[in-house]
């Protein structure tokens, strides 16, 4: 018989009385609008103590030993661990991923096995559905179908996850010839609330339905699975292997899909109506019909994935994260975003990267693209497959199933595998009296329990049980090292030569104290995983550590994001709110400057003055002042001594540094597993999200703020259910989902 661990009200009251959450300037506001779930019985959204209780209980009860009449000793031990986790997270010395903050401990988590993982990877090639929650009725479970990876991507995006996908030549070449062009008819009942809007985007009334012997009719249920299955059927009808009857007309009936604005239970939010799905299905069919008698290219497959992502964004999930990974010599793929019409229509939906190995040398066209628009990014699959931390040396096939990454690039992943993240703010945790080795051990155990979720897809269950991959990240890295060391980790550069090309290079010199600090913490994570894996009788995690880009979660604690340098020593951070957002009156009452958003109607832009941790330190550097060379070197430091997965980093560069991109990509080809770059804009845009300011302006603007937003909001009692978020970003490069 299974039993559940719960935290007592008395314990929580003691923590609230003794621990003060380390809210950043944007922290509580970011939390309230992003992670606080609605409590219908109380007519308000959660408070922070309630969120942390839900999250910790949702996680601790994943320990599989609780499923079989646990002993009192075990229950006591896990309760004590839950209490330590609660205290740690409540104080913001560490947090699980934003996905866990939103979903852990909910009914949606219990129903949906995939719900706790942020991001996934899938290879775009014919695959079997297997013993999964979604299997088209016309397929056997072991039958390979072209639709399967697109179904996986569509399903995970609608659950709020991000998906990396590979359209590398080795995958696309496995897709058979497109045998048929399909006549697609989308129908909606004339009595549907969505009828007029649906007809405008290409549907027809049900009275116009003409069915014959050559047609297939499918009435979509009003479910996520229904959307996925409709797209799967459309794709598979184009291929003789999955259309043996050679049917060439498909009628999809969307009459049952709930109208725009209707409530969505589970993940939350409101429905979009059938219109985004109608547009998507027509567009996907056009891509496939255009290749009838021929083969799909990497660009075609990426287009289908982007069209799916676009539909998901227009639907309930307001941000859809995709990373398209292509072959490094596929010029059509590399240049696909140069088609401005298609870029504006759907190709914006993914960040694009190319797969390389350490022998690759063709960086010139890649560097040119990066200077132009920040793409493509680089993913070194050879390093990912054969190395953990670089300092630990070559380990042939240590992660041999790797084929790609999640959208932010910090976790190398096999087909169907998710990332599984937990984030520690080492400076904050130390300031709150924590032993960092205990903190990182708690983090490892938290992430390990997530691997025992009942996953919906067979490919995911199998690879998770094999790899048990976790990704323990640290954030506020620049804050921590600058405060503890008094300087940045890169203390200088020395002259050297590339061992293969013999080019002159500048090799970074690292502070040896920093090497020791991160090495000890890495070993603490590995030891905790080894011990817990032995206790649970499961495989040790194939890899353990990472640096996630962070963003929304880092804002909670007011820390620098992942390994990134603060955007400026002093900033105006602009956050956009719907005009109806209940936080706006509280923000205005506290003196924050607001103005109408110039880009979006019914939206207000709120300005928050921010001072970076360590801004007054003479060795402080911001993204606007740190060199491109030091950023590459810092990423290499973390890949060498901390992360056995990868290090997510968006390196920013000034116009004057653009000519260094190619040589630095080449210099670090034996160290960097993934990287991306963007030109530094410095707040030159109107109402820029981040605008560097000077100290005097910061102090003046700070004096205008006279109240505590949390207290004023509570006094106004103006909470609202299911408010749509606008303008949320969860990482430096914009690749992560909102939650």
From Swiss-Prot:
* Region of interest called Effector region-2, as start-end residue ranges on this chain: 168-313
Q: Which example biological process does GO assign this protein?
A: DNA replication
Q: Which cysteines are joined by disulfide bonds?
A: 119-419
Q: Which UniProt keywords apply?
A: Allosteric enzyme, Cobalamin, Cobalt, Disulfide bond, DNA replication, Oxidoreductase, Redox-active center
Annotated spans, Effector region-1? 147-158
Database matches in SUPFAM superfamilies: PFL-like glycyl radical enzymes (SSF51998)
Q: Name one GO molecular function term.
A: nucleotide binding
Give EC number(s), comma-separated: 1.17.4.2
Q: Which reaction does it catalyse?
A: a 2'-deoxyribonucleoside 5'-triphosphate + [thioredoxin]-disulfide + H2O = a ribonucleoside 5'-triphosphate + [thioredoxin]-dithiol
Summary of activators and inhibitors of this protein = Allosterically regulated by ATP and dNTP.
Region feature Adenosylcobalamin-binding-1, mapped onto this chain = 565-626
- Note down the stretches annotated as region Adenosylcobalamin-binding-2: 685-724
* InterPro entries in the cross-refs: RdRp_reductase_class-2, RNR-II_ins_dom, RNR_alpha_hel, RTP_Rdtase_AdoCbl-dep
PANTHER family reported in the protein's UniProt record:
RIBONUCLEOSIDE-DIPHOSPHATE REDUCTASE, VITAMIN B12-DEPENDENT RIBONUCLEOTIDE REDUCTASE
What quaternary structure, including any partners, is listed in this protein's UniProt entry? Monomer.
Q: Which family does the record assign?
A: Belongs to the class II ribonucleoside-triphosphate reductase family.
| Listed name of the protein | Adenosylcobalamin-dependent ribonucleoside-triphosphate reductase
Q: What is the lineage of its organism?
A: Bacteria, Bacillati, Bacillota, Bacilli, Lactobacillales
